[in-house]
């Protein structure tokens, strides 16, 4: 679909050290690399280290910046986005997943009631609105995918901010 984009598949098995090694070798092979993606924030630390070691750790908009996106929304990703080094992250919200599961159990399942199908709203979460649908194994909450970027990375409702600031869980 995009003939001018060359996609490089470089498996790292989600391992930080492999991510670092593979990114360093890829930057050697392709010194003008334009973009990188990691399937999770934790191993993405290897990408950040490789970019730093090769002098490519540049802020968004700076000459030589490598577009950097990944998935999760951990505290480190929020930090990198707020500092301007990472472009964006697609968030997964494990805090909401757990809290909403408990909420549905307490409000409905423990009372022998069915979980209501339809709209779900809670302004406590950044995404605010979802939908409960009939799933293969029971009610399933569909939460819209959302992008964390420079415009919204400071929102205190992101799970990475809650885990770090409200719960005191340091990023390691």
Please place each PLM-identified region on the residue numbering.
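Alpha-helix termini
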Residues: 1-2, 30, 54-61, 114-115
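Hinge/beta->alpha junction and helix N-cap segments in small-molecule ligand-binding domains
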Residues: 1-22, 37-46, 72-74, 92-97
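Venus flytrap/periplasmic-binding-protein-like
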Residues: 37-87
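Short hydrophobic/charged patches on amphipathic alpha-helices used for structural packing
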Residues: 23-24, 78
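Glycine-rich phosphate-binding loop signature in dinucleotide/nucleotide-binding domains
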Residues: 26-33
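Extracellular/periplasmic ligand-binding modules, especially the Venus flytrap/periplasmic-binding
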Residues: 39-51, 81-82, 88-115
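Hinge/cleft segment of the Venus flytrap/periplasmic-binding protein
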Residues: 100-172
